[in-house]
Amino acid sequence: MARYLGPKAKLARREGTDLYLKSARRSISDKSKFESKPGQHGRTSGSRTSDFGLQLREKQKVKRMYGVLEKQFRRYFAEADRRKGNTGANLLLLLESRLDNVVYRMGFGSTRAEARQLVSHKAVTVNGQSVNIPSYLVKAGDVISVREKSKKQLRIIDALKLADSIGLPAWVSVDLTKMEGIFKKAPDRDEFGAEINESLIVELYSR
């Protein structure tokens, strides 16, 4: 299945929540009515979504938030299920550990899509080594840096200014001047994703 390239606001309205696909400077929440579904009049009021529909919708929402396609998402779920602990929490921690997501969390990209592009274009390094695989899993203690030749990119400079103004998550440490950050640890489940109900995804794949 190809990656979705259409209007981001339409996706957010479909899922009923901000998917963080646009910069916080122009948050979709400021432009869209999440309760209104795509279409001229939206979904007919009073219709009830089935349990399967709710589970499928939650999976689609998380896939779109992290920019992951179905086949890869299934692999993440299988790995999460193999690991000790809560499968749903394991799944989200794997997604949070993706290099493109960490680059986004560190503020080098204003959106995950922009961060993914930076990784693909070799604009960042991991522990001094060039890594251009967005799905690369970052480990605690890894150092993510913007390459010297990329430090003058206006989109990175603007993204860092934005990150500085709204703050960074506790599990990363970033030197804004050096454009370098440390992935201190995988985040605790209660530190992110309050809008995600991962148990619905576990239920879907357990059918």
Swiss-Prot record:
Residue stretches of biased makeup (Basic and acidic residues): 27-38
Q: Per UniProt, which keywords does this protein have? A: Ribonucleoprotein, Ribosomal protein, RNA-binding, rRNA-binding
- Which residues are in the S4 RNA-binding domain? 97-157
Region annotated Disordered, chain positions: 22-54
GO terms (molecular function) for this protein are:
rRNA binding; structural constituent of ribosome
Q: Name one GO biological process term.
A: ribosomal small subunit biogenesis
Pfam families, A to Z: Ribosomal_S4, S4
Keyword Ribosomal protein attributed = yes
Q: Has UniProt tagged this entry with the keyword Ribonucleoprotein?
A: yes
- Domain of life, per UniProt, equals Bacteria
Question: Would you name any one GO CC term?
Answer: small ribosomal subunit
Q: Where is the composition biased (Polar residues)?
A: 42-52
What does it do?
A: One of the primary rRNA binding proteins, it binds directly to 16S rRNA where it nucleates assembly of the body of the 30S subunit. With S5 and S12 plays an important role in translational accuracy.
Q: Which family does it belong to?
A: Belongs to the universal ribosomal protein uS4 family.
Q: Which HAMAP family match?
A: Ribosomal_uS4_B
What subunit structure does UniProt give?
Part of the 30S ribosomal subunit. Contacts protein S5. The interaction surface between S4 and S5 is involved in control of translational fidelity.
Q: What is this protein called?
A: Small ribosomal subunit protein uS4
Q: Which organism is it from?
A: Leptothrix cholodnii (strain ATCC 51168 / LMG 8142 / SP-6)
